[in-house]
Amino acid sequence: MIPRIIAIVLILAGLLSQSAIALDSKKIYQLNEERVFQIRVLNRETGKKSSIGSGFIVGDGRQIATNFHVIGQIILEPELFYLSYLRKDGREGELKLLALDVARDLALLGSEELLGTAAEMSELPPRGSPIYAMGNPLDLGLSIAVGTNGGILNQTDDSRILFSGSLNPGMSGGPTFNERGEVIGINVATARNSISFIVPSRFLRDLVTLSTTTSLNSKEDLRAEVTRQVLAYETSYIGQLVERQWPSLTLRKLNLPGIISPTVRCWDNSAKLATTALYKRYQIRCSNKNHIYLDSDNRFVGRLIYEYYWLESDELNAIQFHNLYEDLNKDQIESKLGRDTVSNFNCETWFVEVSSQEMKSNLCRREYVEYEGMSDVLFTAALTGHSNQGFFITVILTAVDFESTLPLIEKFLESIQWNP
């Protein structure tokens, strides 16, 4: 009887211990309200805010973590803007940029004064577990949002975890806590389609370590570091694509590369034609969502898009079909970037045999003015020699090292199979 009583007591003690560890949102807020700040980008001339976000104490107590996109304006114009924090009690101070992880949208800032003690960091809790995000939504003061760990965000790498709650603008860069009040990630509220996600804290730990060896003292240092990181990430990503085994999909008489990566989704994009149309057109569009914030002008880069078009007609004569085919095969990268941001496209054209069929290929590149070595690439290849059927492929990559894209384009062509 006594052993049974002891066992019951031990079980109850364990349950009470777990209950005591788990905190509610009110307690988590109270424990961390002095650790979470508003991060501001201020104009040096006017002293007024240009953009705001959130940040929190990490490392030795003189460092603040936030999102890269929160402070992105200083990348292009550090002479015009500077960084500042604002505490809940109204105290403020200037900050210096220490280190960046552009691909994961992280930035580490430094203060000359001791700001406080950092909260403990921990790994992500199991999927479905409650998590709590703190930040300064819409410049309305410090707030906390309750959600759950929704797992890895589809079409991204493992650096983006879905947050089921709502993160309003201004909460980006704030901490995400588990039920024990430990930091398990950083809020990101910029995702399109109103999706919020968090970046796991392990990437922040790496950034704190990196800050001891990084120097970002000039405008040139900033640009060079951003360029290096983006190109390194994209080159690795493209290399992984090339090494993968690609499944195929079928479009009329062709077998084509299908979903070449877990980061990619493919959709039917065929235009709805009138019943009186004299031709048929089929289109498949595949793209990734693994995008990277670059700066306040260029916004998001790292896009991969590939599209397939098939055109056929039994009604048009050869000349009519050729004119229609040419009109449709005029793809370009959708962009509002001006010449002060990117150069004009420089293109080369050649003919290549693909699966016993001749195709006319165009390879175009344009350079980023502010980021040396960074390019957008546009590749097209169109089937030739047929009077009533046509096919063309378009591949678009943004903010990449040009040479790294060539093996990928070559693999696309090698993977096309003609089925007469």
Task: Locate each region found by the language model.
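C-terminal cap/linker of serine protease catalytic domains
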Residues: D24-Y29, L95, V183-L254
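Catalytic-histidine neighborhood of serine endopeptidases
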Residues: I52, G59-V102, R127
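A conserved glycine-rich beta-strand in the N-terminal activation segment of trypsin-fold
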Residues: L23-S25, L42-G61, G93
